[in-house]
Design a protein with these regions (language model features):
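Alpha/beta-hydrolase superfamily serine-hydrolase fold, recognizing
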Residues: 1-190
Length: 190
């Protein structure tokens, strides 16, 4: 299990999530608890790049840690759900793994998305604007282009690993519609 913490890409830490990982460890799962660069250190797409690098590290070191690289499940909540989705969905052609080059196939067996952001651009303006997303994008003139590059909806296609989305309809932080739109697009793609 590869777990990615939430926090709006600007807060949270892997240490804050340790207790929620204990049930998996008790069941004998190998768990990788991922830390990524937050917005105060590096703007988007750094967090996505870091998570792809973490996946590459897990695959490269799978034998040493007795991990079956064909059974990696990636999960996270909120911004971590977004990062779990991008980690499992982004194709190599997106070029978001340039921070950790290699020839490993960065694929996962499944994605569990706990109320993750699926359309970053939707959070940069309009009725769904969220300060955490604006902070993560910064004032870069191409922030809408970057938002599209890091949005899971951009990468919906046939052949993705199974994706389970869990999202409550009263979520004040991540619009419920994000989960609905992802499911609709995944259904269309097959």
């Amino acid at each position: 299990l590869m777990y990615i913490h939430g926090g709006g890409w600007r807060g949270g830490s892997k240490e804050s999530s340790v207790l929620r990982l204990l049930p998996w460890l008790e069941k004998g799962w190998a768990v990788v608890n991922v830390q990524y660069r937050l917005a105060e250190v590096s703007l988007a797409p750094a967090a996505v790049e870091d998570c792809l690098c973490a996946l590459r590290w897990v695959i490269r070191n799978a034998e040493e840690y007795d991990i079956d690289p064909d059974r990696i499940v990636v999960t996270g909540n909120s911004a971590g759900g977004h990062l779990a989705l991008t980690t499992g969905m982004v194709p190599a052609s997106a070029g978001l793994d340039r921070e950790c080059p290699g020839n490993e196939d960065l694929s996962v067996a499944a994605i569990i998305n706990w109320y993750g952001i699926t359309d970053v651009g939707d959070l940069l303006h309009g009725p769904n604007m969220k300060t955490y997303a604006v902070t993560w994008m910064g004032s870069m003139p191409n922030r809408f282009e970057i938002a599209e590059r890091v949005s899971p909806l951009t990468y919906v296609r046939d052949g993705l690993p199974p994706i389970l989305t869990i999202h409550g309809d009263a979520d004040p932080t991540v619009p419920y519609q994000h989960g609905i739109r992802l499911q609709e697009e995944l259904t269309k793609a097959g």
